[in-house]
Amino acid sequence: MRNRRFISFLLVMLLGGAACSRSAKTKKLDIVLVTKALDSEFWQRLKSGAEQAARQNPEVRLAVLAPEREINIDQQVAILEDQILKRVAALAVAPAGVAEIIPVLEKARAAGIPVLIVDTDIPWPHRAGFVGIDNRLGGRMAAEFIVRAIGGRGKVAVIRGVLGVATQEDRLAGFLDVIQKVPGIHFVGAQPANSERALGMTVMENLLTRHPDLRAVFATNDQMALGAMEAIAARNLTGKIVLVGFDAGREAVRAVLDGRMDAVVAQFPERIGERAIQEAIKAARGQPVEKFVDIGTGLVTRENAHEFLR
């Protein structure tokens, strides 16, 4: 009898241990990527890269969330607050603002949730790390191309994204680093179009009306560049105004290939998304995270555009 009881006890312990082992194996690591929006090819490609990283780690359950538009900072704050309440394992965030976002990131820190910053760096010392590009360098690349294309003379404008967003400020600053050193170039200003195509078209139309002798335009993302391209085409000025974009989505690259745009600064959103989740997983596990990961940039011109369409 005593032996039977002992055997029963062992079976219970073994079965219980197996159940615990299965539970430990099936426990998911909840990682949440919060972007500025998902309404453009850039963010969709970044999302795709993040999902690829999650597929390579079966224990990870990834959610990708975003406000409707990049200017909807309040929506991003609400999304982050909701995920903090859910006690997720780690957050990867592309901040839509600075002053508005840092307080909610502090809430995540207080809850013990590591936060990796993606795409748009911010002056927050408690981030686990950053994954993105050197946007100032990208702005310089655009300016150097324009200076060569117009022979260092003429009026130049910038169509820029949301005011105060670090990526946009850095791209503009890099552009001005170069342009302001060229005596023959007259910089007529930077006009915001909130990274939106329709607004980019409107801003370009206004620039053409105000400056009919405009020689070149740098749009700090693809969507605004494509809108500007449409405004230029509507006035039969394609090929007469140098147009440079930023991001290198497929539509923009095709526009460079067929001569409707002149160049586009390339970043690699799939790589950014994939590396961001890889680093977020490390942070969730308490492992060391790289503090600054620069994915790198390139310049798409008519000569190499086909390489970016593979």
Language-model segments: residues:
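Short beta-strand elements in bilobed, periplasmic/extracellular small-molecule ligand-binding domains
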Residues: 56-69, 155-158, 179-197
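Flexible loop/hinge segments that line or gate small-molecule binding clefts
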Residues: 98-137, 145-148, 155, 247-262, ...
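Hydrophobic alpha-helical
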Residues: 90-109, 175, 188-189, 193-254
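Extracytoplasmic "Venus flytrap"
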Residues: 32-53, 57, 62-77, 82, ...
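Bacterial signal peptide processing site
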Residues: 20-23
